[in-house]
Amino acid sequence: MAKLTESMTNVLEGDSMDQDVESPVAIHQPKLPKQARDDLPRHISRDRTKRKIQRYVRKDGKCNVHHGNVRETYRYLTDIFTTLVDLKWRFNLLIFVMVYTVTWLFFGMIWWLIAYIRGDMDHIEDPSWTPCVTNLNGFVSAFLFSIETETTIGYGYRVITDKCPEGIILLLIQSVLGSIVNAFMVGCMFVKISQPKKRAETLVFSTHAVISMRDGKLCLMFRVGDLRNSHIVEASIRAKLIKSKQTSEGEFIPLNQTDINVGYYTGDDRLSLVSPLIISHEINQQSPFWEISKAQLPKEELEIVVILEGMVEATGMTCQARSSYITSEILWGYRFTPVLTLEDGFYEVDYNSFHETYETSTPSLSAKELAELASRAELPLSWSVSSKLNQHAELETEEEEKNLEEQTERNGDVANLENESKV
């Protein structure tokens, strides 16, 4: 009984060493994202503007995401062609040279073994002996014959004879495998050379996005341009808002993606990128910027990712260019400087002013607050809110002046009546 009690006590107290040995399953707590660990609980740190915003997509278009703890690495080998194409140039060239060198050495060794087993090495000076390959007297000559066979050079000094069936079979195998290696490696190099990644470097985005009034509506705008004379065919643009989100159930979504409408329903997202264009997003009730004002914008932790896609006119391959804007790169109350001018018989684009902006009169209220003010004043939203507010202020000033004049006239009438009564 005492032993049973002692054993139960040990189980309840928990011997860590015994648990490590006997427990077959290790329970791992889920690891929260770093941003979730920083934000929970939220009331601990309210000053979120001092933290540096981590980019999801860098300005040069590269995604700032690293894949770690990938255990199923065999999946990269199942798609070996894409894996080789995605490698850096130095590794790609190294593999290119190594593959050819290894195949030449491998088949050169087999040719030497055939000659050695047949005894050709012992009858080099015997004119009556018919070797498998003439003038093959060592491993170096076998290696050279392997290169000549696979690359179909055929100098004619070393020739296979018809008295060697195993050599004929090896010749067929090396010819077929050599063609496969050539097709694979040359195709890999061709695809890597013809990739349109470099074409995306001549597609430029403005360094800043701006928010200002356009046609009486508050809009978010950025500019895109193409530096080449050969154009992008079927160009289209998309924009997404990357922002952390916490659901009503308490779930934290660190990189929640929300679509930003840049003309999908009207067809304005289809671009003719002959000259730089300003892409506009109307801030309405469906916009994620509906409730964001000028004062609130610097406090937001968000990122706008813009994606420009199209086909390269010269090759017909699909090209994609990316960029992003964080809150510090969104200017409220600014517009882009015009870059297109009419010269003698042609239009000229001045890319020196491509990134330049100038300040303009823009309400500091959010689009929601502007809509509420417009509805109270019974003004249609399509009108210029700022101008209508100015007109409303002018009307109030005119009414005050009229009231003042009427009051002055009344005071004058009263004074005249008093004078007449005295008389």
From Swiss-Prot:
Describe activation and inhibition of this protein: Activated by phosphatidylinositol 4,5 biphosphate (PtdIns(4,5)P2).
An example of a Gene Ontology cellular component annotation for this protein is: monoatomic ion channel complex
Which is an annotated Pfam family here?
IRK_C
Residue numbers of Phosphoserine PTMs: 16, 23
Q: Does the keyword Transport apply?
A: yes
UniProt keywords, alphabetically: Ion channel, Ion transport, Membrane, Phosphoprotein, Potassium, Potassium transport, Transmembrane, Transmembrane helix, Transport, Voltage-gated channel
Q: Where are the transmembrane segments?
A: 90-114, 167-188
Q: Which InterPro entries match?
A: Ig_E-set, IRK_C, K_chnl_inward-rec_Kir, K_chnl_inward-rec_Kir3.2, K_chnl_inward-rec_Kir_cyto, Kir_TM
The reaction(s) annotated as catalysed by this protein in its Swiss-Prot or TrEMBL entry are: K(+)(in) = K(+)(out)
Known role = Inward rectifier potassium channels are characterized by a greater tendency to allow potassium to flow into the cell rather than out of it. Their voltage dependence is regulated by the concentration of extracellular potassium; as external potassium is raised, the voltage range of the channel opening shifts to more positive voltages. The inward rectification is mainly due to the blockage of outward current by internal magnesium. This potassium channel may be involved in the regulation of insulin secretion by glucose and/or neurotransmitters acting through G-protein-coupled receptors.
Protein's name according to its UniProt entry: G protein-activated inward rectifier potassium channel 2
